[in-house]
């Protein structure tokens, strides 16, 4: 009796597997691409909503600094970074985040470097404490006027007023570690 029951289970399992394989073979590449596109769209939609919440939390903190607003901004960063992290499975697919040429890059501007550039030279943004225990200088925050981030072919940028344009111009200006915008820069600050 146990052998017969085991045999039935094995046959049922085999039939289920063959049926699933047959269904998989019938699935067209269009259906697979549509599913992929829907997953990507859902992930990017969630990322945009979370990034918008992060922007609101940062604005609240900047306009009315408090421990509560700081905690809310940190929590919003964690949520936003997590949802953006899920979109990284779509990297290197020539999509709206990292396309470097063609109509997609023209339409979306390939913002991946502005969002997620790494590694980060923290000293470019604000002071750090060096190995001698002294505060460093020569960063965006303590510079009035033109700031040159250093590196290869770096261009000085006016940081008298820190604007979106100034930060975008500084980002990766002179080298990959010259990161002035995105999740890692916000995390440092």
Describe these PLM feature segments.
Residues 1-11:
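Bacterial N-terminal signal peptides that target proteins for export
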Residues 13-16:
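Short, linear, compositionally biased motifs with a strong N-terminal bias
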Residues 19-21:
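N-terminal signal peptide c-region/cleavage motif recognized by signal peptidases
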């Amino acid at each position: 009796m146990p052998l017969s029951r085991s045999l039935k289970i094995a046959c049922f399992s085999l039939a289920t597997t063959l049926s699933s394989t047959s269904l998989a073979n019938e699935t067209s590449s269009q259906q697979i691409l549509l599913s992929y596109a829907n997953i990507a769209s859902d992930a990017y939609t969630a990322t945009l909503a979370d990034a918008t919440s992060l922007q609101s939390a940062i604005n609240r903190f900047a306009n009315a600094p408090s421990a509560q607003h700081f905690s809310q901004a940190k929590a919003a960063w964690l949520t936003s970074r997590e949802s953006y992290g899920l979109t990284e499975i779509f990297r290197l697919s020539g999509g709206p985040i990292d396309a470097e040429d063609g109509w997609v890059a023209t339409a979306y501007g390939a913002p991946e470097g502005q969002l997620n550039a790494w590694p980060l030279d923290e000293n470019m943004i604000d002071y750090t404490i060096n190995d001698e225990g002294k505060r460093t200088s020569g960063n965006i925050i303590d510079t009035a006027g033109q700031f040159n981030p250093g590196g290869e072919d770096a261009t000085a940028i006016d940081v008298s007023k820190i604007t979106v344009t100034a930060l975008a111009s500084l980002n990766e200006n002179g080298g990959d570690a010259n990161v002035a915008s995105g999740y890692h820069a916000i995390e440092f600050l």
